[in-house]
């Protein structure tokens, strides 16, 4: 399990960020990390068709169906939760505890506010 050694959600998020950076770097994309942590995205990735804001999420949570569920809400530095707003980021990159990754465009997330169930 990918998050076995993680002692809190912040360390789990750090593992997710590392996985995302490795994923995009292996594709040959340039990855930039914003200077601060107050925006609603974690990375800026240079895709062939331009720069994309990428939000990285991790999950160990499963629905009753056994499929992974990932929350879309973002947390501010003061522990405030914000529901997903279209345009907050261009790409959602998800990492499960098994190391499986998923990418969703903002178009694919239309209609969702709090969470999505991953396909498998």
Task: Annotate the PLM regions.
Residues 1-3, 101-120:
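Charged phosphate-binding loop/patch that engages nucleotide di/tri-phosphates or the phosphate backbone
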Residues 57-102, 107:
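Catalytic cores of nucleic-acid endonucleases
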Residues 1-32:
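Acidic-basic catalytic patches of nuclease active cores, encompassing PD-(D/E)XK
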Residues 40-41, 51, 88-91:
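Short, surface-exposed beta-edge/turn micro-motifs
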Residues 24, 43-45, 50-58:
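Conserved catalytic cores of phosphodiester-cleaving nucleases, focusing on short active-site segments
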Residues 31-38, 47-48:
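Active-site metal-binding core of divalent-cation-utilizing nuclease and nuclease-like domains
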Residues 33, 53-55, 103:
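A structural signal for short, well-ordered beta-strand segments and their strand-loop junctions
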Residues 31, 40, 77-81:
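A generic local structural motif
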